[in-house]
Amino acid sequence: SIGVALVIITGGIDLSIGSVVGLVAVVLAFFLKVQGMDPWVAIGLTLCMSLVVGLIHGLLITKAHIQPFVVTLCGLLIYRSLSRWLTDNQSLGPVPLEGDKGYANLDQILGLDFIFSGKIPLGGFNLPTPALFLLVLAIATAIFLRKTIWGRYLYALGNNEDGARYSGIDTDRMKIIANVLCSFFAGIAGILFAFELDSVQPAQTGEFYELYAIAAAVLGGCSLRGGEGSILGVVIAAAVIRLIYNSINMVGISTHLEFGILGMVILLGVIGDEFLKKKMAERQASKA
């Protein structure tokens, strides 16, 4: 959601991140089990792959002048197909399950399993290590957006692209940076999911995650017109969406209605947000 927020702030969209998450998870598992690669090298290569994906998106959008919707929609289909082709649509895990063979560097893999999917005891509470990754990335991204000139450029680009360009901002570079960061964050998520799930399903890992991410970004205050949004709002919205999803399961509502209920809640939240913004604008105009 954080990566998608960066793209949306610039006025773009990314429909491919769910498939990027799935592809990174599959490639990591393939490197570790099939290729017997050193775990740190495998992680480095998969992260580099996610950076290249973002760079390709950015170049197609800025240099080939293809709409972000089209570029990332094609990416969604291509990356999912690659995941299924690479594994012949069979499950593959980065961490060996009972009876699994073919893993080199087993001790390193098990150590990384704790880093990416372990739990740290804090008193009577166990803190999942992925929560630390979320905290670090959220703080770093918030500082990037609010305290650096690059972050202000992203907001300026989303508010008025022509105005930003005429003021001397390299808008193409900023779009590329936003897309690269988005895919990089998706790559980190893919690694975390690979170790958390233990068994990667090429057709299902990351499925619909792009919709959850976009929903969290919009519900968290990012305008699809660009130029608005905060990382804190996005993180809170992502937590609320997960809470709603879990509540639906706990109450015992039919699983066939889960997406419908989630969609209605998000729609009502966005409508309420737009209503409040309109009222605040009218109040400020009346004071002026």
Label the model's feature ranges.
Residues N159, Y166-R173, I244-A288:
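Cytosolic-side transmembrane-helix boundaries in multi-pass membrane proteins
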Residues M37-T46, V52-H57, I61, L122-Q201:
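Helix-loop-helix "hairpin" substructures at the membrane interface of multi-pass membrane proteins
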Residues L6, F30, Q35, L55-K63, ...:
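Membrane-interface helix caps of multi-pass small-molecule transporters
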Residues S19-L23, W40-C48, V70, A131-V136, ...:
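Hydrophobic alpha-helical transmembrane segments
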Residues G3-A5, L47, R80-S83, F133-F144, ...:
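Hydrophobic core segments of alpha-helical transmembrane domains in multi-pass membrane transport
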Residues S1-Q35, L60-I66, I214-A217, G221-I231, ...:
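Single transmembrane alpha-helix segments in multi-pass membrane proteins
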